[in-house]
From Swiss-Prot:
Regulation: Inhibited by N-ethylmaleimide. Redox-regulated during autophagy since reducing conditions activate ATG4A whereas an oxidizing environment such as the presence of H(2)O(2) inhibits its activity.
This enzyme's EC code(s): 3.4.22.-
Family listed: Belongs to the peptidase C54 family.
Reaction equations catalysed: [protein]-C-terminal L-amino acid-glycyl-phosphatidylethanolamide + H2O = [protein]-C-terminal L-amino acid-glycine + a 1,2-diacyl-sn-glycero-3-phosphoethanolamine
GO term, biological process aspect, one: autophagy
Residues annotated as the enzyme's active site: C77 (nucleophile), D279, H281
UniProt note: domains: The LIR motif (LC3-interacting region) is required for the interaction with the ATG8 family proteins. Required for proteolytic activation and delipidation of ATG8 proteins.
Organism: Bos taurus
Name this protein carries in UniProt: Cysteine protease ATG4A
Job of this protein: Cysteine protease that plays a key role in autophagy by mediating both proteolytic activation and delipidation of ATG8 family proteins. The protease activity is required for proteolytic activation of ATG8 family proteins: cleaves the C-terminal amino acid of ATG8 proteins to reveal a C-terminal glycine. Exposure of the glycine at the C-terminus is essential for ATG8 proteins conjugation to phosphatidylethanolamine (PE) and insertion to membranes, which is necessary for autophagy. Preferred substrate is GABARAPL2 followed by MAP1LC3A and GABARAP.
UniProt lineage: Eukaryota, Metazoa, Chordata, Craniata, Vertebrata
Keywords: Autophagy, Cytoplasm, Hydrolase, Lipid metabolism, Protease, Protein transport, Thiol protease, Transport, Ubl conjugation pathway
Predominant location category: cytoplasm
Amino acid sequence: MESVLSKYENQITIFADYLEEFPDTDELVWILGKQHLLKTEKSKLLSDISARLWFTYRRKFSPIGGTGPSSDAGWGCMLRCGQMMLAQALICRHLGRDWNWEKQKEQPKEYQRILQCFLDRKDCCYSIHQMAQMGVGEGKSIGEWFGPNTVAQVLKKLALFDEWNSLAVYVSMDNTVVIEDIKKMCRTLSLSADTPAERPLESLTASNQSKGPSACCTAWKPLLLIVPLRLGINQINPVYVDAFKECFKMPQSLGALGGKPNNAYYFIGFLGDELIFLDPHTTQTFVDTEENGTADDQTFHCLQPPQRMNILNLDPSVALGFFCKEEKDFDSWCSLVQKEILKENLRMFELVQKHPSHWPPFVPPAKPEVTTTGAEFIDSTEQLEEFDLEEDFEILSI
């Protein structure tokens, strides 16, 4: 009996207690691009939040690297937040933003496959093992705390080995998103066998137009766009607050990574000037697949009251996430950014059409030549030499 209780520790299923955490207000709550009216849609809000995959500290998994830690308690919170953001992208990719999880009901096979990407085993492509060991290539020792930018770089590199989800991961640099580079990456990486990879972007675009409306979609690799930012020096500059909140309203929103120094949260929305977040700082026991090949998912959804914090208490180091399944989604995102973000006198980030001339040439990332495939390749830190270290992002002018 004690083992059963331990398995489901920290799970609170009394919905009334959950909803009492929200004030009685006419204000809208925004969660990852969807709005909820508290007075009339509290149960829908609850369902929407609890449907997000929730990754927390775990214990009793196999030692990382064979001899490393068997728990990430105290150091893995930003890695868990990165997992949550990526998992939301995969849910949108395979099941759609409107899909909802229901407790103790059979879930789609795609859902189970997504969940298994994140189990705490070295053979799972986005496990704590893979992320921690890939972090060595970013200058982070196993067991060391990661910042938002480091997690973004790790996800970008691990995604190269994930053939099933087939994501193009773009991490902006110098607070600048380059439209030309993203379209080059997403189109090039998903070309059909009869389309030469070396064809220029203009030629590819013309070819797609001649083939009809469906060709453009089939030539687009789903995009995970991560924008690391520093919105101040020691604290967030209030001038960025409105633009930051606007990002949670965008249909492409995957929320934000951030929190406080050495204390990471996954921000999924806001109410007024309070950010709503999922907190990874709960230590649960490692969950593995069962005999039927599925994993018990009851501890991977947060049924506790959602936590909130005033946006001005946020550490200025953050990373915004967006998912664009099709090219039209990215085009729509660009329009929203131009309308809501670039209108500010002090812009949170820049969106430019062309690759800056003073930057090195853009080369779409490619999987290194290694002797194994998939997640198994990162069995030791020596195999990380194929990757170049990424520089940290710059501080925005304030």
